[in-house]
Amino acid sequence: MKKIKVNLQPIVKNINLPTVLKTAIMPGDSEESLFIATQVGKIYYISKGAINTFLDIRSQIIELGTSNGGYDERGLIGLAFHPAFYYNGLFYIHYSLAGTQGPGALSKSFNKNSILLSS
């Protein structure tokens, strides 16, 4: 059996509770970006070596860790891009809405000009 050497190295730091990793090409771009969704409600994307904020819905997410000894399966738990995301900007998220017991959803198209860049 032939041995294969594998090395791992981190690509980001200080992003807590990642729940989803996806790649997609943003409208108007020519390269794929890596998207990282976090359980607390913030989605980042990495493009050309920079980490940016794609969406921040932390204020709309149910407060995590308030029961069950700090363990929680709620929050932002799903992210999917429409097959034609590059053309129509549609994406879908699954999250636990604050003040409810069930999931919530945003029904808005993505607007590249409204991205909040992280500092």
List each model region and its residues.
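Acidic, Gly/Ser/Thr-rich repeat motifs that build Ca2+-stabilized beta-propeller blades
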Residues: 1-119
